[in-house]
From Swiss-Prot:
Chief place where the protein resides: cytoplasm
UniProt protein name: Holliday junction branch migration complex subunit RuvB
Family to which the UniProt record says this protein belongs: Belongs to the RuvB family.
GO molecular function: ATP binding; ATP hydrolysis activity; four-way junction DNA binding; four-way junction helicase activity
Species this chain originates from: Methylibium petroleiphilum (strain ATCC BAA-1232 / LMG 22953 / PM1)
Length: 355
């Protein structure tokens, strides 16, 4: 018999990870919405971006103007969607939400733009995935609040100009480098979201535990925060799984001991690594002598797709200094050897830190 929770909906091992930064199901997305802060005062972390937005939003409200267009970029799970909702709420306007892949044709975007009210916010997630033809009609909308649309077909077709209400576009992306220069240049406010500190995540866990009515002491919240990989989405997911464990194996309260046992059951170690992380490091170290090793060889060794390794598993290991990408392939660092309890090689030690 197999068991699936709301967090384990896909057949791919990487997609089923409890430490995945992607929302796993509509049910999880609904829970995320319930846990979202409603205003900047409740928003934890991203101090620089929060301070800037407080000023820009306050100024726009005083002038009764639309806020400048906003680009939010950074790794997944850090709160770009949450921040877009907060911006709209702070401005006191409506929010219309869509995503780049959904806007397949110019008419799809035109239908949304023409229905926006004055100073409304349009949030486009994965904006780097807009098609070029859709992006083209977005330019005059952002600059002049106008769009040109074609009426009719064939020789009788003609272009008409439609005036739009002033609005704010919030674009979110995990890959800012994939944005075209003309699109990037049209954002007046650009904010990079960074990974959260353990202290910030502990505050988020404490707040979410309160909303979920789960008694959680400081040490228990801190234990969850330390294993959340700097990402609020993961912190809230781990909190819910630890809550389940506490209610079945304990008295319903979350302390450090209960959190540690629950996370050990989930195979999430003190560094926030799961089975897939350790599997990759073990393959590089034990099967390929620490590297360098090509991506395809690693993929074959652990039975995972190359794209999944590159986009889903590797980034956190690289960011934490356990793995390096070099022109010759992947190399395990000394930290990776220590984490697995293996002595680093002495003869090729210099390769561990090659760039």
């Amino acid at each position: 018999m197999s068991i699936q929770t709301d967090d384990f909906a896909s057949s791919s091992p990487a997609a089923r990870r409890v430490v995945s930064t992607a929302p796993a199901s509509p049910n999880e997305e609904a829970i995320e919405r319930a846990l979202r802060p409603k205003g900047l005062a409740d928003y934890v972390g991203q101090a620089k971006a929060r301070e800037q937005l407080e000023i820009f939003i306050g100024a726009a409200r005083k002038r009764s103007e639309a806020l400048d267009h906003v680009l939010l970029f950074g790794p997944p799970g850090l709160g770009k969607t949450t921040l877009s909702h907060i911006i709209a709420a702070e401005l006191g306007v409506n929010l219309r939400q869509t995503s780049g892949p959904v806007l397949e044709k110019p008419k799809d975007l035109a239908a949304i733009l023409t229905n926006l009210e004055r100073n409304d916010v349009l949030f486009i997630d994965e904006i780097h995935r807009l098609s070029p033809v859709v992006e083209e009609i977005l330019y005059p909308a952002l600059e002049d609040y106008q769009i040109d649309i074609m009426i009719g077909e064939g020789p009788a077709a003609r272009s008409i100009k439609l005036e739009l209400q002033p609005f704010t576009l919030i674009g979110a992306t995990t890959r800012a480098g994939m944005l075209t220069n003309p699109l990037r240049d049209r954002f007046g406010i650009v904010a990079r979201l960074e990974f959260y500190s353990v202290e910030e995540l502990a505050r988020i866990v404490t707040r979410s535990a309160g909303l979920l009515q789960v008694p959680t002491d400081t040490a228990g919240g801190l234990e969850i925060a330390k294993r959340s990989r700097g990402t609020p989405r993961i912190a809230n997911r781990l909190l819910r799984r630890v809550r389940d464990y506490a209610q079945v194996k304990g008295d319903g309260r979350i302390d450090a001991a209960i959190a540690d046992k629950a996370l050990a059951m989930l195979d999430v170690d003190p560094q926030g690594f799961d089975v897939m992380d350790r599997k990759l490091l073990e393959a590089v170290i034990h099967r390929f002598d620490g590297g360098p090793v090509g991506l395809d060889n690693v993929a074959a060794a652990i039975g995972e797709e190359s794209g999944t390794i590159e986009d889903v598993i590797e980034p956190y290991l690289i960011q934490q200094g356990y793995l390096q990408r070099t022109p010759r392939g992947r190399i395990a660092t000394a930290a990776a050897y220590r984490h697995l309890g293996v002595l680093p090689p002495t003869t090729s030690g210099s390769e561990l830190f090659d760039a």
